[in-house]
């Protein structure tokens, strides 16, 4: 049965769905990161497979487009030896008016064991988790503006890999925070793991007004936001989610909030620069930073496979 306190956990407090980092105990987040560390080396093997999900069926249901996230989930599932189905939503019954729950019911009848769901509506993975059979697991691959927990977890893994400990870090999250589910997941991950200073940096039109309860410091200039930071996480402008004139122009945005090598010098000399992708060079970040020695953007992608392997193996190993 699902826990009344947290629908992601069973009555024993074990992870059966990953819907959000918010509300997860630190012990579970740490367990995911520790498990991911054991999977990183699979990348370097001649045969990049482990048999943990052999015989299991993983259905990737991406109601929103995403090449990077869908691909890494597919690779992660296959490296766990699962059978993987990528549903073509544009040609599925969902595009013909079938309800979300009817789609899930029909796919469940095909003996699905795990659904990876990306949806434009916040809360869609929660709804699915409430209606699947006890042996079926749900992983949120991004829902509306709400959450992107595996991206948040891979960001936490990347920070831990390079900085070892969260207890003395200053982390700046820069850009379109208003529309960013990644920012919310990163904030929850950082506060859960004990990061003492999390800064949210952006123009007033792109920073939500309700962040104070999340324990972050809001900065409206890039210079203030990244000064002496250990980690700088850059976010793209999500123009597809914007309505109205939230920004004067991409050029004006880059002038004020684009990360250049000169501005990066305000951060600590050993600061790392992260980005969840896709990157818009010359809008939120200069190419010289993307390709520079402080960027760890490609390692994020590599670590993302291991983190998603960890999440799938953990939830699939627990019963509702």
From Swiss-Prot:
Disulfide bonds: none annotated. GO terms for molecular function: amino acid binding; aspartate carbamoyltransferase activity. L-aspartate binds at residues 96, 181, 236. Carbamoyl phosphate binds at residues 68-69, 118, 148, 151, 277-278. It catalyses: carbamoyl phosphate + L-aspartate = N-carbamoyl-L-aspartate + phosphate + H(+). PANTHER family: ASPARTATE CARBAMOYLTRANSFERASE (PTHR45753:SF6), ORNITHINE CARBAMOYLTRANSFERASE, MITOCHONDRIAL (PTHR45753). This is Aspartate carbamoyltransferase catalytic subunit.
């Amino acid at each position: 049965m699902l826990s009344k306190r947290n629908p992601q956990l069973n009555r024993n407090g074990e992870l059966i769905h990953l819907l959000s980092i918010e509300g997860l105990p630190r012990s579970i987040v740490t367990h995911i990161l520790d498990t991911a560390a054991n999977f990183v080396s699979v990348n370097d093997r001649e045969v990049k497979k482990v048999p943990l999900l052999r015989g299991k069926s993983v259905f990737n249901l991406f109601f929103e487009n995403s090449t990077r996230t869908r691909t890494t989930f597919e690779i992660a599932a296959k490296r766990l030896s699962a059978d993987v189905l990528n549903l073509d939503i544009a040609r599925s019954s969902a595009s013909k008016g079938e309800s979300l729950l009817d789609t899930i019911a029909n796919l469940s009848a095909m003996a699905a064991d795990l659904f990876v769901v990306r949806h434009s509506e916040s809360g869609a993975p929660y709804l699915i988790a409430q209606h699947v059979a006890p042996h079926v697991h749900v992983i949120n691959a991004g829902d509306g503006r709400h959450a992107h927990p595996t991206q948040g977890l891979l960001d936490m893994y990347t920070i831990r890999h390079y900085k070892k400990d969260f207890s003395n870090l200053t982390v700046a999250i820069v850009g379109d925070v208003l529309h960013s589910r990644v920012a919310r997941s990163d904030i929850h991950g950082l506060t859960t793991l004990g990061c003492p200073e999390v800064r949210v940096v952006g123009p007033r039109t792109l920073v939500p007004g309700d962040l104070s309860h999340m324990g972050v410091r809001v900065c409206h200039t890039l210079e203030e936001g990244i000064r002496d930071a250990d980690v700088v996480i850059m976010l793209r402008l999500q123009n597809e989610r914007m309505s109205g004139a939230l920004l004067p122009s991409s050029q004006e945005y880059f002038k004020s909030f684009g990360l250049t090598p000169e501005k990066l010098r305000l951060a600590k000399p050993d600061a790392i620069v992260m980005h969840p992708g896709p990157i818009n060079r010359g809008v939120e970040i200069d190419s010289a930073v993307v390709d520079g020695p402080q960027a760890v953007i490609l390692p994020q992608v590599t670590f993302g496979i291991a983190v998603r392997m960890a999440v799938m193996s953990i939830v699939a190993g627990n019963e509702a």
